[in-house]
Amino acid sequence: MNRRCFTLVAASLMALSSQAQQVDFNIASRKAAEVTALNFTPVGVKQGNTYQFALGGLEITLDAPVKDQIIKSNWFKQGIQLGDRLTSDGIVVYPSKGDNAQLRITIRGLKPGHHSLLAYHNIVDGLTGNIPSIQVSREKEQITTMKKGKKRIQQKSMMQEILAQDIKQTVREMKASQSGQSYIEFDVTDDQPVVIHYQLQGVDNANNTLTINGLVFDKANPKATALNPYPADDDLHVNAEGGKVVLRWQAGEGAKQHLIYIGQRADQLKKVATTEEAAFEATSLSS
């Protein structure tokens, strides 16, 4: 009974793509098993102004492009102990006093085509007061044509294409679905690296740190998908007395219908119902 219910929630409602690459930034001083979220690749980042790691076929470089800013890992210990392994730790950019933090992420190895990148922004330090928002941009080549005499000369330069802004950072939120999130989409046309900038907006922020807890490539925007399912992902001990259990979840923004699939394997699901409610009673379950 447990297995069928679990497969429905994890594979259908959460819609985890087998192609998605997911990284959980961990505090470097703890064991990965203690602080890594389910289905995420652990990366413990040591203090410095640059850090490089591999993720599947990708090569990712983190660096702080502003002088005297450093990257380090940090955590909210109580949040980890209560089960939030994704957004209760992460990497933090600490700038000099009065500066706004910036983080540059260079990604090599993305295949040509359309891609997305989700980042979680939940501050693990116990900050109060004004919490700065985040702007996300991509480095993009710009070609300018200039006329010099009878000749036309093309000059290449790099510009920042803004992909998202006014992204709110949460503070010690212990549920990933409720934490600060940025979600961007972009196209890759060749084998050139993709360079993404995260930077704080405004210049008068007493709390001028920037936090990223994890990254997810090429997965649907969580705000538009079902979240917080019951039974929870990987819960193999749900009580399905009499072969029944009521499945519940948080509907995605704007969702009008929900398609329900049940099966014993993620690649062998069968559609059993369509409902307008974010709940469904599964019956005739067996082990």
Regions found by a protein language model. Give the residues of each.
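Bacterial N-terminal signal peptides that target proteins for export
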Residues: M1-T7
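Hydrophobic h-region of N-terminal signal peptides that target proteins for export
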Residues: A11-Q19
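Compositionally biased, intrinsically disordered or flexible polar/acidic segments
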Residues: A20-P222
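Surface-exposed loops/turns
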Residues: K111-P112, A240-E241, S286-S287
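Recognizes extended acidic, P/S/T-rich segments that occur
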Residues: Q257-S287
